Amino acid sequence: MSGPILVFDSGIGGLSVLAEIRKRLPAENYCYLFDNARLPYGDLSESELIRGCVELICQQVQQVEAKIVVVACNTASTLVLPVLRQRLTIPVVGVVPAIKPAALLSKRKHIGVLATPGTVSRDYTHGLISQFAEDCQVDLFGSSELVMLAEQKAAKLPVNNQQLAKILAPIKASKLDVLVLGCTHFPMIKEELSQYLGESVLLLDSGEAIANRVASLLEPAALSEALHSGTTLHGGANSGTKGIGVIHAAYTQAITAGLNITLQEYGISDSSLIVTK
């Protein structure tokens, strides 16, 4: 398996996951695929989300010959993973909200989950709460507006602090001590969240856990390939110049100059608009 790692999201949120994976596997090549034409996913019907995501991801997997797919979107992960795993012959990794570690770390036994309206309403999320946080008070907060604030920041536009404060006011008033960032967009505005909520609220996301999972799936294969071929392993099966892989981005709607700068800041060397089926 020598193709790139395909990281998928509705927008720029998956960049936070991409960054964590790249820390673990810097020599791998990557394709960052984002469906910005249909952003935000939290407002889509389940059937529309499943159909669109599966078609887009499968199309791009074939195009770039990806060796693994990371669905770096909580909303999509709650719905599309079973379908993708039926359609594809390569590993598919999804995002699980960090509810289990949040429950373990909470001293007050009062945690919150901040995600899109779709994620907080799904049985999948409520199942995680029942399984891992029965001994905690768990407050659910759904916001698509916060997704768009993160997108604005990525486009180099100022964050609307008044709007941010209005969204976060119920969280601050709840007196919880651990907040799960149940949308991959939200680590992009972690600094703003921390500034408003204060140091007493611990913010948790799943980026590092996803990176560990991807590495566990790829590293044994890379090691086995190196041992059987007699070659030297330099951190990944598809190494770039001096052990650093390249990242290509693909998107479904034209991007702004500001967002292009953000992509470059994440090490993305080139990008292109793709036509969906």
UniProtKB/Swiss-Prot annotation:
Pathway involvement of the protein, from the record: Cell wall biogenesis; peptidoglycan biosynthesis
GO process terms (BP): cell wall organization; peptidoglycan biosynthetic process; regulation of cell shape
EC number: 5.1.1.3
MF term (GO), any: glutamate racemase activity
TM spans (from-to): none
Catalytic activity: L-glutamate = D-glutamate
Gene3D superfamilies membership: 3.40.50.1860
Source taxon at top rank: Bacteria
Enzyme class: isomerase
Protein keywords: Cell shape, Cell wall biogenesis/degradation, Isomerase, Peptidoglycan synthesis
Entries under InterPro entries matching the protein: Asp/Glu/hydantoin_racemase, Asp/Glu_race, Asp/Glu_racemase_AS_1, Asp/Glu_racemase_AS_2, Glu_race
Pfam family, any one: Asp_Glu_race
Binding site for substrate: 9-10, 41-42, 74-75, 184-185
PROSITE patterns according to UniProt: ASP_GLU_RACEMASE_1, ASP_GLU_RACEMASE_2
Catalytic residues in the record: 73 (proton donor/acceptor), 183 (proton donor/acceptor)
PANTHER family linked: GLUTAMATE RACEMASE
Family that this chain belongs to: Belongs to the aspartate/glutamate racemases family.
NCBIfam families in UniProt: glut_race (TIGR00067)
Function: Provides the (R)-glutamate required for cell wall biosynthesis.
Protein's name in the database: Glutamate racemase
